């Protein structure tokens, strides 16, 4: 809503989505964008050797450990059950991402970068580039209180150091404070959301219908979807569902769920 208002700034966006929602973003009138980049349109399966000299120079220029980013990317390594990336593929993807992000920052010279909590290496890479180039970053993430978010430059770290003396006391006792905390229970918020989604047969059928009946070529154009097809995804979901049931059964049979009151 507030981004629709004209405050004298220009809005640019890097859009990281599969192929299906792309038409919506191309036609949307909710937000006026001066420039937009569809991230996966710029990352290709080239088959060419990566430019190691460029990557080394990039690391020195920005003081960013690219190896650390890729090693911690679940898509590239053992947590990906659908596709095994070669070292050259990983480095080629990284090279294209670095060049794309440098081009974008050089072109628009942003004053601010607004992002959700970075979940993939390429998101965190752009975040680090902005930080190194003194671009103000605003990261939005869930707080320890349910139904509340925090905006700061670093995750789980406020941009200021509030002092207790700056807050007016409401003279609540411990139990009242505990009740207040429980009223914003983040665990309950997540559980309620999961139950709403998991218990909705209509949404499950709708998702299955979209997956099996509509064509989506993201597995050919998006490296995050490489190796996926309908039969593999179905087989994978069945396998994971069986594993989940087995583990739940094991936990219920073998682990205590009640902590003795006097146990230290």
Predicted regions and their residues:
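Conserved N-terminal ligand/cofactor-binding loop architecture of enzyme catalytic domains
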Residues: 2-98, 145-258
């Amino acid at each position: 809503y507030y981004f629709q208002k004209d405050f004298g700034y220009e809005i640019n966006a890097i859009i990281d989505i599969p192929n299906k929602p792309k038409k919506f973003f191309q036609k949307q009138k909710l937000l006026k964008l001066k420039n937009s980049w569809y991230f996966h349109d710029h990352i290709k399966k080239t088959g060419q050797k990566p430019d190691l000299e460029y990557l080394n120079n990039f690391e020195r220029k920005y003081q960013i450990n690219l190896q650390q980013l890729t090693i911690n990317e679940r898509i590239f390594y053992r947590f990906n059950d659908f596709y095994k990336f070669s070292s050259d593929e990983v480095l080629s993807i990284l090279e294209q991402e670095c060049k794309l992000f440098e081009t974008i920052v050089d072109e628009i010279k942003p004053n601010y970068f607004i992002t959700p909590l970075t979940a993939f290496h390429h998101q965190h890479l752009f975040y680090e580039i902005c930080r190194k180039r003194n671009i103000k970053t605003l990261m939005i993430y869930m707080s320890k209180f349910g139904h509340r978010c925090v905006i700061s430059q670093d995750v789980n770290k406020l941009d200021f150091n509030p002092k207790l003396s700056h807050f007016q006391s409401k003279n609540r006792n411990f139990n009242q404070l505990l009740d207040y905390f429980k009223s914003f229970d983040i665990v309950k918020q997540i559980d309620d959301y999961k139950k709403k989604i998991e218990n909705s047969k209509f949404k499950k059928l709708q998702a299955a219908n979209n997956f099996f009946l509509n064509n989506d070529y993201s597995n050919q154009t998006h490296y995050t979807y490489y190796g996926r097809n309908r039969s593999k995804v179905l087989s994978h979901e069945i396998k994971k569902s069986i594993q989940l049931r087995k583990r739940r059964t094991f936990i219920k049979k073998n682990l205590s769920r009640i902590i003795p009151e006097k146990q230290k």
